[in-house]
Amino acid sequence: MGKDRIAYLDFVKFVAILLVCVGHCYVMTPNLDSIVRPIIYSFHMPLFMLVCGYFSTRSLEIPVKSLLEKKSRQLLLPVISCTIITVCLFGGGIRMEIIGCVWFLKNLFICYLIARFVKYVNMPVEITLPLSWVILLIIPYGGTLMINFLYFYFCVGYLIHRHLDYLQIYKVLLFSISLVFFIVALCLNWTNPPEKVDINLLMYSPFKFVVQIFVGLSGSIIVIGVCELIYKLFGKWQRVGKVLSYFSTIGRYTLGIYVVQTFIIERIITVYIKLNEAILSPAFTDFIFIPLIGSSLCIVCYYVVRLTRPIKIINILLYGGQK
């Protein structure tokens, strides 16, 4: 994988964490009937998990014990630290915070473990990974933390990396199909936050389940395709290239930004600031104001990470020892 491709994927990671920050900022507008928020929520975490799956190939080749040690330091230690800080500083319920605090890191940790154990099965991963996902769909509590929903995208990301050369031949076709499907989904109001996947959803609303799977997948493919296109068209322009390089640098700190935004956006800004007054028009608030606030706070979180990362204890406890 060349340097250009690494940079463009870091740009994708930047877009993913930007969408997370913007999406969380809509909590400040509880009375706003947002058009943008449900669209963001329909694919932003699938996008994140797909990218994680893409970069998981090396980790999934090491022994389970080594993987457990590595991902415990990188993912579980920040989870424990954030949960303790949240309970102590913000008074959250212990049980609620144990489950919900930085929930995506817990989800990702479990996805790594499941995929690694699956790779021990003496069958092609193209068979075992989908089978393991189907098992997750039907077992009790598989929908906890949306694991059985997001694990699908982790597997897709891994398989994309595994068959990247072959898929490059069809990338324009895949992008075009995804774009058409997502536009249709927008028109039919299918772009909504995914529901918890359990046996009731699978039995009584199978169409809704299939739709939310493909909305998340198509939205992710569109973002990745657009980011690649932007890099190809403008990456060599001096000024634009510097901006893209800056955004790509931010994309390398997504774990830290995700942790920091948990405190700054989720526990402080959106709790104490509520935009209930009709000072601004709903359309301006929805399409411009909140996205600008979320984008600005994403940049703030990035600089908080950069400033605090050199402090060894903070880096270890909150950022997974990021280098």
How does the language model describe each region?
Residues 1-323:
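Alpha-helical transmembrane segments and their immediate juxtamembrane cytosolic regions
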